[in-house]
Amino acid sequence: GELDAMLEAMVQTILKQSGSISPASFDAIEATLDAYLGPLPQEFEVNGKTVTPIQWRDQLGIHPSEYVSLTSFTHHPFGQEFILEVPDNHAHGAFLNVPLDDLEATVNNALDQGYTVAWDADVSNKGFSFRNGWAIMPETAKTSEEWKTLDAMPAEPTVDQAARQRDFDSQSTTDDHLMHIVGRAKDAQGRSYFIIKNSWGDGNAIEGRQFVSMEYFRHYTV
């Protein structure tokens, strides 16, 4: 859109300048964002009370230093942090690398302890259906018509560390979307799913939520 084009032109102009970046450049970018989006609020109202952003942060009791970002890939050693090589990791954030089984167990343990989990995953494959409220990994490929008439969860392959790594290396698995794991469920066959909240509104079969199969989670978590 217009804002993207404006910022892109400004950033490219700044990058072409030799020497250090002028502080005025940052002021210009901030002024542009303010013009399009409005300035950052200095205070706002919550439950009838006026608070500053810092006051609201402190009231929530969230301590970012107590949270850890996890991933699971074999091109780096397990038990160590590394900067995940995906385009959206603009801040070069480090992730603790753990075996796939440990990653799944950690999410289950967090849910057992009453916590929820921020989840980053590939959502660009045919097994991810927001409209139907599921994210599954069928053992055999489905046609578009078969997806439309699917009335039971199909069999899924067992996902291991090697299969997951293969699709990440080939870029079949991509860094697409962040969601929120809030619970678990089982289907009539006893298969387990994570319940996620998506940010795409509530206009699907289950009010904006989705059931993510364990195999989908193991394969497509970034």
Feature-to-residue mapping (PLM):
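Non-membrane alpha-helical secondary structure
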Residues: 2-3, 21, 25
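Extracytoplasmic mature domains of secreted/periplasmic and thylakoid-lumen proteins
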Residues: 1-11
